[in-house]
């Protein structure tokens, strides 16, 4: 679709109000976090972890936590960008009824979005697979820092190499010299970020909340997502079954491109600048 027509179509949806935004990794690239399918993304640097590996493969789990100890620092320092703040403005103006994000970086929350569902969780929390205890990631990081003095500073890190799930590729000798901390409650090292990994279902409470948001919306705008993961693609399918228009704003090809009402192939940040200007926000 021609850019002017796509912009006009998205603006009309927003002017009518009650729009549900669905966001993906492309929203956070301007914050310095590569998406999964970029040249530096994890699907090109090696596959992401699975739930089964966290639960049953101590070597893979140890490797992840060594890599994540380094990569999470970059994620924690990342700041919301203009797209995150644009979505906050649209929500405060009463044009967005809610946001469903597939991202686990917590940047929508930190930007101030209120009616928000983090479909795949948030890296800011960890969970013990042994006893179920949850705690803030920063508390685990403090224990890891105590057990691994000087570890982070000894590694030359390219921030652009950090994956959306918070880890970064490390040489084996760095992985081997890393010491893992245990659960604050039971001491088990069976820890996992409280996010949905491959082989793990989206919690039913989040599915229910997404269904409620979609039921109350008149349209859906997808931003920065190829919708390759079924949990995001399903929202588009359900919206269209209900006769609700769907727009996609994304820089690359996506799974739902052939079926949406408005397809705007462009960078997400500049697109939302144009949207806010058109709405006088």
Swiss-Prot record:
NAD(+) binds at residues 24-44, 102-105, 224-226, 250-252, 268. NAD-dependent protein deacetylase which modulates the activities of several enzymes which are inactive in their acetylated form. It comes from the Bacteria. InterPro entries: DHS-like_NAD/FAD-binding_dom, NAD-dep_sirtuin_deacylases, Sirtuin, Sirtuin_cat_small_dom_sf, Sirtuin_class_II, Ssirtuin_cat_dom. Belongs to the sirtuin family. Class II subfamily. Its EC number is 2.3.1.286. This is NAD-dependent protein deacetylase 1. Signal peptide: none annotated. Pfam families: SIR2 (PF02146). The keyword Metal-binding applies. It comes from Corynebacterium efficiens (strain DSM 44549 / YS-314 / AJ 12310 / JCM 11189 / NBRC 100395). PROSITE patterns: SIRTUIN. It is found in: Cytoplasm. It is an enzyme of class 2 (transferase). Residues 1-281 form the Deacetylase sirtuin-type domain. The keyword Ribosomal protein does not apply. The active site is at 120 (proton acceptor). Its cofactor is Zn(2+). It catalyses: N(6)-acetyl-L-lysyl-[protein] + NAD(+) + H2O = 2''-O-acetyl-ADP-D-ribose + nicotinamide + L-lysyl-[protein]. Keywords: Cytoplasm, Metal-binding, NAD, Transferase, Zinc. GO terms for cellular component: cytoplasm. Binds 1 zinc ion per subunit.
